[in-house]
């Protein structure tokens, strides 16, 4: 029996990890241990740990790693301490983390420093913020890489990672997107009390390196949404530095045409996204999930500036007029053909590709002592 310790810190990463967590939980030779922390535990963001515990995983650990406004460095330290103590107790064979959040960095650090295998999902990607540095740091602490596409493979090889330890599995959330068990739009509207026939979705997160400018950017952004006259479904920003100023502005604009939620269940969010007129903000969902559904999206500012921009994506700066104009353009475009460029075009599900890796004995024989692989210089 192999024990895998996984960590989820946000509504977003849990939604993406769910298919893989279900596979591990139901595997006769694997034992899932899941830490639920970060935004999941915070009242401001809807205490989404309840969404995780609803899945009834056999081994789940709830940990509140921060108080509102606590510095990110302190939160990282809190998280490392908890994961380290739990890891010593349960002795996992592998630590599995996702993405570029500090909870993932904490898990990778603990795994690497305790000579346990670290498996990183969706490394090798680019955005446009400090998240890049965190993601690449996690990759350098990891032994096994489960990436979305060939571009990610190339970047990890450039970073000195061994090619045979990098596996393309696509993006796991796309398994959820293609699921036949998603609720209907009518069910979602009834659950959240949404009266709109037509609407756009807004997700606007802080950029930590621009935190001092977030009050100005947030004011300009939400003013543009109001001026557009569109019905807007907005989701609260994540809890990175600068979130308070965004949330303060967001709450000013709540009205019959602007409804905000601390969180929306991932599957329900996907249904809303699929039927939206457009998506606007700086979330990766506008770069990845929206194009797969053919939904036009407006990417605002620098947070996603280094990611692949498909033909359904309109990029703009933080100026109110430019955001307003981009929304008008998106509304005039209608739906696009589905774009699965990010996923590499493989017809297999991410879960199938994940199973291939996790059931391979060679995966478990990877040395915990990493070597830097030089390019041919």
UniProtKB/Swiss-Prot annotation:
SUPFAM superfamilies: UDP-Glycosyltransferase/glycogen phosphorylase. It holds the Pfam family Epimerase_2. GO terms for molecular function: hydrolase activity, hydrolyzing O-glycosyl compounds; isomerase activity. The keyword Isomerase applies. It catalyses: UDP-N-acetyl-alpha-D-glucosamine + H2O = aldehydo-N-acetyl-D-mannosamine + UDP + H(+). It comes from the Bacteria. Its EC number is 3.2.1.183. GO terms for biological process: carbohydrate metabolic process; UDP-N-acetylglucosamine metabolic process. Keywords: Hydrolase, Isomerase. Belongs to the UDP-N-acetylglucosamine 2-epimerase family. Homodimer. Catalyzes the conversion of UDP-N-acetylglucosamine (UDP-GlcNAc) to UDP and N-acetyl-D-mannosamine (ManNAc). This is UDP-N-acetylglucosamine 2-epimerase. It comes from Neisseria meningitidis serogroup B (strain ATCC BAA-335 / MC58). The lineage of its organism: Bacteria, Pseudomonadati, Pseudomonadota, Betaproteobacteria, Neisseriales. The gene is siaA.
């Amino acid at each position: 029996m192999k024990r895998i310790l996984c960590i989820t810190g946000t509504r977003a990463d849990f939604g993406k990890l769910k298919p893989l967590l279900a596979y591990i939980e139901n595997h006769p030779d694997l034992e899932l241990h899941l830490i639920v922390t970060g935004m999941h535990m915070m009242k401001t963001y809807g205490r989404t740990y309840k969404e995780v515990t609803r899945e009834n995983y056999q081994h789940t650990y709830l940990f509140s790693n921060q108080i509102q406004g606590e510095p990110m460095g302190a939160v990282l330290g809190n998280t490392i301490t908890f994961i380290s103590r739990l890891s010593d107790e349960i002795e996992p064979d592998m630590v599995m983390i996702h993405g570029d959040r500090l909870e993932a960095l904490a898990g990778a650090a603990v795994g690497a420093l305790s000579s346990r295998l670290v498996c990183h999902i969706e490394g090798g990607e680019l955005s446009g913020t400090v998240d890049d540095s965190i993601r690449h740091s996690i990759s350098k602490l990891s032994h096994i890489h489960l990436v979305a596409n060939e571009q990610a493979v190339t970047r990890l090889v450039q970073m000195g990672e061994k090619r045979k330890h990098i596996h393309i599995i696509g993006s796991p959330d796309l398994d959820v997107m293609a699921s036949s068990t998603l609720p209907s739009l009518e069910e979602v509207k009834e659950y959240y009390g949404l009266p709109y026939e037509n609407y756009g979705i807004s997700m606007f997160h802080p950029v930590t390196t621009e935190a001092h400018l977030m009050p100005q950017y947030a004011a300009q952004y939400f003013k543009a949404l109001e001026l557009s006259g569109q019905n807007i479904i907005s989701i609260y920003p994540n809890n990175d530095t600068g979130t308070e100023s965004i949330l303060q502005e967001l709450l000013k604009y709540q009205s019959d045409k602007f409804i905000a939620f601390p969180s929306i269940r991932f599957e329900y969010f996907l249904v809303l996204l699929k039927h939206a007129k457009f998506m606007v903000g700086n979330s990766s969902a506008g770069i990845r999930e929206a194009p797969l559904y053919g939904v036009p999206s407006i990417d605002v500012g620098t947070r996603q500036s280094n990611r692949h921009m498909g033909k359904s994506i309109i990029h703009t700066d933080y100026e109110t007029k430019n955001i307003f104009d981009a929304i008008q353009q998106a509304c005039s475009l209608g739906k696009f053909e589905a774009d699965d460029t990010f996923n590499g075009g493989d017809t297999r599900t991410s879960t199938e590709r994940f199973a291939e890796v996790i059931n391979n004995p060679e995966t478990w024989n990877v040395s915990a002592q990493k070597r830097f692989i030089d390019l041919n210089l």
